[in-house]
C-alpha cells in the first residue's frame, strides 16, 4: 500500500522533518546505529553480556521506518540507500537463511527470541516489495522460512507468524500457513506469560511487557484473516479491549513503563509502544472494519506520538508522561529505573530500541491511511494525502485535503474512471458529522461502522465534523479532550542542550519556565480554533482551551535523596538509590491543597505540542474555595 499513498500537508512536513532529523542521520543515536547494519559483512563483536541478536533488532526498527519514510516522500536518494540495505540481505543468503550469520544459530538461552529481529527487518522488506513488486523479495523470504530450523512456537519467535501470513497472502503456499498455525497453537499450548490467548479471553488483568503484549495480540486477527476461524479473532479483540479498558493513558497509548501496570496518570508510555500498538491496531482496523481502532490509532499518534519527540525530530523520550514538568538526565519518575535519564529528550535516552522504533510511527500511520478491496475504497484514518489505485483496470485518485485532527473537516477531491464506494469513519469522539457531495448534503453515517458513499464520477466530498470539549474526571483528577486531541498546560521550557563528543544532535535538560502548579475549579472549557495550522509546535498557531484554575502553593517539584528503584519489572525487584533527584510530583489531593491568589484563566494547548506539560490536574471545588475565603 505504501506506493499508492503520497503524504501531503502537515504529514508530509512531518516526514520531511523526520528525514532531516534522526531518520536520515541515525548515527547521531550512537551504538548500535553507528556501527551495525543488516547486510553489513564486518561488524564489531557484541558488547559483553548483550544477546547477539539485540543490536540487529534495534537497527531493523530504524530500517523499517527509514524505508517507508523514503518511499512516502519519493526521496530517490534515500530510496536507493534503502534498496542497498534490503538487497544486501535478499541477494546474499547463507544457503537459504537471510540475515547476519552471527545470529543464524540460536545462542543458548535465546532459542525463543533468536528470530525476533527478523520480524522487524522483514517488515522493511515488505515495504520494499510493496514499492517495487520485485518477486525476488518474497521468494527469498519463503525459502528462508521453509528451510529454517528455529523454533517458531516460542516467544518472541512466534511473532514471525505475522510475516509468514503476509507471505501466504502473496504466494498461497499452504506450507507457510501450516507453519504459522502450528507455531501459534504450540506457543499457546505452552505459554507461561500473560501475552497469550488464555489470558486474553479470561478476566485476568495481564502483567506483561507492553511491547510483547502489543506485538503478540494482533496475531489472532491475522490468522482469522487467513483461515476464517473466529476463535483466533476473539483473542485479538479481547486482548486489545482489555488493554484499552485497563491501561489506556491520557496520551492515547497504553501504560508501558516497561510493563502493563494500570491506567493511573502518573504512569508513562514507552515510545516503542506508540509504534507497536498502532501498527497492530491498523491490522485489526483493516480486518474487522471496526472504526474504534481508527479512533484509538489517531489518539495515540497525535497525542502520545507527537508528545514524545522534539519539534525537529532530533530527540525523543524513552518514557513519556501526561504530567512532566522536568526532563533531564535524572528525572524519570517511574518506578522502573527511577532517577535515570529515560524521560529526557535525547537522540538515545535509554536503551536503543526507542531511537529505532520512533522512526516507524508516522510512516506507518501514513502508509495505513487508505485501503482498497475490489470496488471499495477505505479511508481508514484521516490525514492530508493522495491515494491512487485501480479498480477494474481503471484509475482512481482521491486527494484528501485536511489539517485533521486540529481542524475537524476533511475534503476528498475525487478523479475516477470507475464507479466505486468510498468508505469513511465517523469517529466516536465527534458529536456531529455533516456530509456533502459537490456541496449537496447527504445523510450522515453511523459511528459503529464504516459508512459508504457511492461514487459514480469525479466529485468533491466533504466531511464536516463537530466535537465537544470533554472533561474526564476520575476521583479528584481532571483532564480535557476535544475530538482526537488531549489538551495540556504546556510550555517550551528552559532548554539546555548537551552534546556528546562527535555528535551534532543534542540531548536536553528541560525545566519549567512558567507556573504549572494549578488545580482546576470547573469542568467548563472554552475552545478557540486555529487559523493556519503549521504543526505541533508551541511557537506556531495552535487551537487552545481556556479553563479556570488556581495555584496550589504546596504543589511543588519532588526532591528525594533516597528512594527505591525497580530494576526488574516482571518480579518488581527493587534496590536503593542514594543522591539528590528532582521529579515531577504526584497530584495534591483537594483536602491537602493550599490555594493562593485568585482564580485564573489558563490556556491548554494540544498535548503533542507540549514537551513539558501538565495534563491531569487536581479537581477543586470552586464553591468550597469561595466558602473558605468568606471564612477568612
For each of these PLM feature ranges, what is it?
Residues 1-76, 108-131, 158-175, 179, ...:
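Aromatic (Trp/Tyr) and acidic
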Residues 15, 236, 295-303, 308-410, ...:
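C-terminal beta-rich recognition modules with glycine/proline-rich loops and embedded aromatic residues
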Residues 28, 35, 76-114, 119, ...:
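Helix-terminus loop motifs that line ligand-binding clefts
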Residues 88-91, 121, 127, 186, ...:
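Glycine-rich, acidic and aromatic/proline-enriched surface loops and short helix-turn segments
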Residues 149-151:
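Solenoid-like repeat scaffolds
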Residues 420-423, 451-472:
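C-terminal beta-strand-rich structural cap/linker in extracellular carbohydrate-active enzymes
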Residues 430-452, 469-475:
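Solvent-exposed beta-strand/loop surfaces of large extracellular or lumenal domains
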Amino acid at each position: 500500500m505504501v506506493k499508492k499513498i503520497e503524504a501531503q500537508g502537515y504529514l508530509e512536513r512531518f516526514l520531511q522533518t523526520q528525514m532531516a532529523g534522526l531518520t536520515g542521520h541515525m548515527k547521531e543515536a550512537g551504538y548500535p546505529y553507528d556501527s551495525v547494519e543488516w547486510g553489513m559483512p564486518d561488524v564489531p563483536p557484541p558488547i559483553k553480556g548483550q544477546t547477539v541478536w539485540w543490536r540487529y533488532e534495534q537497527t531493523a526498527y530504524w530500517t523499517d521506518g527509514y524505508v517507508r519514510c523514503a518511499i512516502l516522500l519519493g526521496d530517490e536518494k534515500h530510496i536507493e540507500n534503502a534498496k542497498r540495505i534490503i538487497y544486501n540481505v535478499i541477494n546474499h543468503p547463507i544457503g537459504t537463511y537471510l540475515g547476519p550469520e552471527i545470529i543464524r544459530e540460536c545462542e543458548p538461552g535465546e532459542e525463543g527470541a533468536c528470530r525476533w529481529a527478523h520480524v522487524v527487518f522483514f517488515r522493511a522488506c515488505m515495504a520494499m516489495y510493496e514499492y517495487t513488486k520485485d518477486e525476488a523479495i518474497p521468494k527469498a523470504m519463503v525459502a528462508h522460512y521453509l528451510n529454517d530450523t528455529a523454533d517458531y512456537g516460542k516467544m518472541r519467535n512466534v511473532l514471525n507468524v505475522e510475516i509468514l501470513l503476509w507471505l501466504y497472502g502473496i504466494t498461497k503456499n499452504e506450507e507457510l500457513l501450516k507453519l504459522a498455525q502450528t507455531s501459534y497453537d504450540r506457543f499457546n499450548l505452552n505459554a507461561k506469560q500473560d501475552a497469550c490467548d488464555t489470558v486474553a479471553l479470561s478476566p485476568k488483568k495481564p502483567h506483561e511487557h507492553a511491547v510483547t503484549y502489543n506485538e503478540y495480540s494482533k496475531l489472532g486477527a491475522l490468522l482469522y484473516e487467513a483461515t476464517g476461524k473466529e476463535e483466533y479473532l476473539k483473542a485479538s479483540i479481547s486482548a486489545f479491549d482489555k488493554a484499552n479498558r485497563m491501561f489506556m493513558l491520557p496520551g492515547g497509548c497504553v501504560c508501558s513503563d516497561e510493563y502493563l501496570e494500570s491506567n493511573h496518570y502518573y504512569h508513562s508510555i514507552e515510545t516503542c509502544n506508540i509504534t507497536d500498538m498502532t501498527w497492530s491496531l491498523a491490522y485489526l482496523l483493516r480486518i474487522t472494519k471496526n472504526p474504534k481502532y481508527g479512533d484509538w490509532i489517531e489518539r495515540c499518534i497525535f497525542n502520545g506520538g507527537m508528545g514524545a519527540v522534539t519539534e525537529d525530530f532530533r530527540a525523543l523520550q524513552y518514557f513519556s508522561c501526561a504530567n512532566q514538568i522536568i526532563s533531564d538526565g535524572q528525572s524519570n519518575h517511574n518506578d522502573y529505573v527511577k532517577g535515570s535519564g529515560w524521560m529526557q529528550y535525547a537522540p538515545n535516552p535509554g536503551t536503543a530500541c526507542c531511537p529505532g522504533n520512533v522512526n516507524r510511527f508516522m510512516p506507518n500511520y501514513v502508509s495505513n491511511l487508505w485501503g482498497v478491496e475490489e470496488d471499495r475504497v477505505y479511508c481508514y484514518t484521516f490525514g492530508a494525502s493522495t491515494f491512487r489505485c485501480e479498480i477494474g483496470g481503471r484509475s482512481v485518485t482521491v486527494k484528501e485535503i485536511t489539517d485533521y485532527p486540529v481542524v475537524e473537516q476533511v475534503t476528498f477531491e475525487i478523479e475516477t474512471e470507475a464507479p466505486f464506494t468510498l468508505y469513511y469513519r465517523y469517529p466516536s469522539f465527534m458529536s456531529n458529522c455533516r456530509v456533502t457531495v459537490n456541496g449537496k448534503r447527504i445523510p450522515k453515517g453511523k459511528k459503529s461502522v464504516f459508512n459508504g458513499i457511492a461514487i459514480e464520477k469525479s466529485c468533491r466530498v466533504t466531511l464536516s465534523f463537530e466535537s465537544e470539549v470533554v472533561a474526564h474526571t476520575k476521583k479528584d483528577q481532571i483532564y480535557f479532550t476535544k475530538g482526537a486531541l488531549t489538551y495540556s498546560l504546556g510550555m517550551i521550557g528552559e532548554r539546555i542542550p548537551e552534546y556528546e563528543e562527535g555528535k551534532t544532535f543534542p540531548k536536553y535538560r528541560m525545566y519549567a519556565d512558567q507556573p504549572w502548579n494549578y488545580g482546576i475549579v470547573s469542568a467548563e472549557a472554552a475552545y478557540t480554533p486555529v487559523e493556519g495550522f503549521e504543526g505541533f509546535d508551541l511557537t506556531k498557531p495552535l487551537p487552545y482551551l481556556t479553563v479556570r484554575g488556581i495555584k496550589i502553593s504546596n504543589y511543588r517539584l519532588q526532591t528525594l535523596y533516597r528512594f527505591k528503584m525497580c530494576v526488574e519489572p516482571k518480579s518488581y525487584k527493587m534496590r536503593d538509590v542514594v543522591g539528590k533527584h528532582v521529579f515531577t510530583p504526584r497530584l495534591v489531593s483537594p483536602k491537602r491543597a493550599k490555594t493562593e491568589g485568585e482564580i485564573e484563566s489558563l490556556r491548554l494547548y494540544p498535548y503533542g505540542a507540549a514537551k513539558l506539560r501538565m495534563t491531569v490536574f487536581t479537581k477543586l471545588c470552586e464553591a468550597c474555595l469561595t466558602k473558605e475565603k468568606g471564612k477568612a
